Structure formats: structure tokens, C-alpha cells
Amino acid sequence: MPRKKSAAKRAREQAKKEAAVPATDTATIKTSETSATTVKPAIEASKSYVPSEDEEEDEEEEEEEDDYGELITDEVENGINQVLDAIKNNKTDKLLDPKVKFFEDPESAAAKLANREGKHKPIYLKDYHRMNILSGDALKEDDEEYEHATVDGKQSFVSQQREEKTQLLNEIKSAFSDEENEESSGDEDDGFLKKKEPSTKKEGKNLPDPTVNEENFLEEFVNQQAWIPKKGDKVISLDLNNNEEDDEEFEDAAEKFENAYNFRYEDPNAAEIISYARSQATLRRSDDSSRRRKREEKRKIKEQIKAEKETALQKKKTKKLNKLTDILEQLTKEYGAEINADMVKKITDTLLKNDFKEEEWDNVVAELFNEEFYQQEGKPTWNEDDEIMGDFYADADGDDQTEEGEVEKEQKEEDEEEGPKRKKSKKEEKLQKKKEKRKVNELVENALEQNKLALIEEVEKEEEERKSRSRTKEEQDLKFRYREVSPESFGLTAREIFAADDTDLNEFIGLKKFAPYRSKELRAKDKRKVMKARRLREWRKKTFKNENGLAPVEAEAGEKDEDTILIPVEKASKSKHKRGHSHKHKGHQKK
């Protein structure tokens, strides 16, 4: 659809048409009634006139946009306000009266607009160049450029140095002049701290709140021409082609996105060469052969076996040491024997040759405390705190109780005086016990070191026994082994199990129910289900034609034998088959 023409444009077109038509008295046309009759046919003819497509296109091209409302003058605004007031107040008489005019004539409006456009005629680039040429400024600039120009059109080195020199001198002069001004003012801080002049901000347009009064807001918005941008206002450019920097940034961002999308399946580190350090094992060549590798493997195996033997020997030695130490402490406690190297040697020899048992304790003691032991000088002594000899001391004290009753008070007094001395004696006793224990350990270790071969033989013997108890090679190669299960007959007799066929037994209960990995709950549930009396009767009736199963049948007089098992006649034809498969179904009884 073609755009609507503005009032000024319509006025200009009307003026052109009137200039083409013979001149008439416009005043009489406006005032007289006959003029109205002559204007009506012209208006009807103009309505019936349809412009062609070319004319419409030319009009659209020639038409200029009124972005800032320059065509809306004060007179037009007043007319619009009068029309709105008349509509609001329902002044239909005023609106329908042809004599009342709210807007001025189009001719005068067009003339005013032409005068305004003439006053503010823009200066184009051509006009600017023309003005420079006429004034002669352009020729002066060309002469100056020609003086400093070179053959290739660039500025010469001499002229460049001259400009830099003059610029440097000007900067030095300006710096000295600033220092003189600072000294004359007498304020040292003026050069560094200067108060900024308050910026006079232009007050914005005060518009009423549109939510409170829309009509007042619209009226003020039109009166103040708030739609026209002022200097300093932020302008949002909707045309991206105007800003070259924005175009470059947008193109870069678009290119990055396109590359990222096109190469999204590629390896991001494909362009980098990753290097790996060479290991020392593969860096140099070695003369390894298959024989050498086998020798190394054998050597490692031997070292491993040797280390295991050393570990086992050390464990055995520690075990024997603790055992001998306990025995010696027990002998000292019970028999009051003094521990020496000969006694330790006898005990170690006895225990290493034969395994020590509590039943043979008397024999060991008899070997230790023989005639040689009693022929030694001195006699055994026991500690007063000993449990075994405590009764003996108690009896001795009982006999002399009457005699010692009088002396108790004196002993108590002596004990109170000798309290600190007893504490010292207890510490000395502890140290003495530690020394004796350390001495016993040293004696036992020396004895075990002398009998090291016996310990090694014992360790090797235990290793051989362990290997003999372990599974053989064939057993190790087996991936499956049968597992023993508890026997279960599920309410059937041995005679019924041997007499029934495989299909009948599988119908009664399948072999899957005997799986050892089944849980106890499932096995108990299957057992309750299978051993129901009704189910047993039905299965026996179907298999043996008898609800009670196979009854004991007596053998004939000439063929009585305790080992004979009689089978019913109906199943006689299948007896061979049953006997051949009887071994398979023994699992129903044994399991």
C-alpha cells in the first residue's frame, strides 16, 4: 500500500494543480455558494482519478520521512488540541460547521515550510569543496604539502625532523611557563590537586507519571517534543552495518563459533606433538636370551624360597625361645632351681629332640633333677611369696604364733622406721628380675643357635607335610569337584527309590532341588511341598498302582533269601533297565 501523504505535501500538490488550471478568484470560491457547486465536480473527478503504478513509485521515492515531527507546527498542534477538546465535550455543531476551521490553509503552511527549509539548507561535500576552491584555501594546502613531499608522495626526513623539533621546543616552553605560574601563585599543591568544576547537568524533561494521568502525560509529551533526542543522550544504533568495529567483532565471533561447530569432533590437541621420555630398559640393547631369562627366573625362585625359609626359621626360633623361657621360669618358680648354662642346654636338647607334652613333664623333670643335681653344693631356695610354699610358711608361723605375738609390736615399729629402705629394696628386686630375665634369654638364644640344624630340619619337615596335605597337580587342574550333601529321601523308602523309573523320580522331585547353592529357606519350602501326604499318595498310585507304595512281599518257599528284593510283575520287563540306572538314583537316598 502507498504511504499516506502529509498535509504539507498535499498542499504543494494542490498548489501545482491550481497553477496549471486557469487562474480563478480564490476569494469568491471560498465565500460564495456557487463556488461550492463548481468545486464538487472537481473533487469528484479527483476522487475518480486513479494514479498509475509508476506515479506511485515516484511519489514514494520523492517522499521524505518526518522523523522528528518538523511538519507539526504550533498551529497544527493547536488545531489538534481544539479537535480533541471538541470530541471530548461532544461539540458536534462545531465539528460539523463548515465555516469553523481548526487548521490553516495548505498554501500558507506550504509557504512557511518552504521558508524554513530555505533557512536551514544543508551543506554537502560538493558545496564545501566548491567554497574552498573559490576561497583559495585548497591551493595553499596543496602548495604546503608539495613543499614537504618526496617523489613517492611521503613526507621527507628533513621535514619530519623539523616538525618533531618544533613540537619538542613547544612542549619545553609550555612546561617552563607552567612552573612559573605555579611559583607566582605560591601554592605548591595547585599543580597536583585541582578541584573539578561542577558540571552543569541539563535538567531532563519533567513528564508526569503515565500511570496516574495518561492524558496529561500525552499532552506534555507532545508539547515538549520528548521524542526528539538531545545532545548527550544515549543512542542505541539498531543498524549494525554503521559500526565497523562492531562488524569486525561480530565476524570474529561468528568465525570462532563456525570453527568450533565444524571441528567439534576433532581432537583439540591434534596440532600438538606429544613427546614421551624413553625408559632406560628400552634405551640400551641387552644380550638377553631365553636361557639367560630362565636362569634369572630360577635364581629369583631360589631367592624367594630362601627368604621364605629364613622367615619360617625366624618364626620357629622365636616360638622356641618363648616356650623355653616360660619353662625355665616355671622350673625356677616351682623347684627353686638355679638357672645355668648346663640346665638350659639339657632342656633345649630334650625339647628339640622330642616334642614337649604335659604328660611327659615328670620325665623331663627327672632328667634335670638327677643325682648330679642333688650332689651339688647348697640347697634350693624359694621365695616367701611363692604360692606352693606359702602353706609351709603358714604352718611354721602357726607353730610359733604364740612366741611371735609379743614381738609383733616391735616388728611394726621397725617396719615404720624401715619404710623408705623397703621401697629401695623393691626397686632393686625389679632390676634384679630384669637382669635375670635378660640372662635367661641370652642363654636360650645361645642354646638355640647351637641347635640351629635341628630347627632347620624341623622347618623343612613341616614344609614337606604342608605340601603333602595340599592338593595334587591333577586336583589343581580340576575346575569342578563334587560336593557332598546331606542325605534326604523326601518320604520315600529305599525300595521305592530303586524300583521307580527316572522319569517318575524326576516328576516327584527334580535334581535341581538338590543343588547345594540353594538357600535353606528354599530347600525347606521344597521339602514341605514334596512331602505332603496327598502328593505322596497320588505319586505312589500313579507309579506303583497303590496308594501305600510297595508293600513288603514274602518270597516263595523255595526261593527265600534275605538279600533278595522282589519287584512287582508290572515292572518286570524294565528290571534290567532299572538295575542299570540304580546307581544314578542312589543320590536320592544318599543326598
Curated annotation (Swiss-Prot):
Residues 25-38 have a biased composition (Polar residues). Residues 52-70, 177-190, 383-418 have a biased composition (Acidic residues). Transmembrane segments: none annotated. The keyword Nucleus applies. Residues 574-591 have a biased composition (Basic residues). Its main location: nucleus. InterPro entries: Kri1, Kri1-like_C. It is found in: Nucleus, Nucleolus. Residues 1-70, 142-213, 281-303, 375-442, 454-478, 548-591 are annotated as: Disordered. GO terms for cellular component: 90S preribosome; nucleolus. One of its GO terms (biological process) is endonucleolytic cleavage in ITS1 to separate SSU-rRNA from 5.8S rRNA and LSU-rRNA from tricistronic rRNA transcript (SSU-rRNA, 5.8S rRNA, LSU-rRNA). N-glycosylated. Belongs to the KRI1 family. Interacts with KRR1. Required for 40S ribosome biogenesis. Involved in nucleolar processing of pre-18S ribosomal RNA. This is Protein KRI1. It comes from Saccharomyces cerevisiae (strain ATCC 204508 / S288c).
